[in-house]
Amino acid sequence: MGTARFLRAVLLLSVLLMVTFPALLSAEHHDGRVDICRLPSDSGDCLRFFEMWCFDGTTCTKFVYGGYGGNDNRFPTEKACMKRCAKA
């Protein structure tokens, strides 16, 4: 029973890494810096409810942030998101 749970956890972790790692790679600049506007939205690890804004590749969209974790593609207002991520 314990082995099955362990294997399930390893499989889940592997799938999460396969999904997340390419997204992080595509968010890198040529000099290795991460472009936060290309990161996927991430609600974080907690269950609190904060309305935040993230850039989805074309525009800023509202999402719910849990209050801990996540990534830097998170802004308190649509204006702050557009100022940082909208390309002129």
UniProtKB/Swiss-Prot annotation:
Disulfide bonds: C37-C85, C60-C81
SUPFAM superfamilies listed in its UniProt record: BPTI-like
Tissue: Expressed by the venom gland.
Prodomain positions: 28-33
InterPro entries referenced in this protein's UniProt entry, alphabetically: Kunitz_BPTI, Kunitz_BPTI_sf, TFPI/VKTCI-like
Signal peptide (UniProt feature, chain positions): 1-27
Keyword Lipoprotein set for record: no
Record-given protein name: Kunitz-type U15-theraphotoxin-Hhn1k
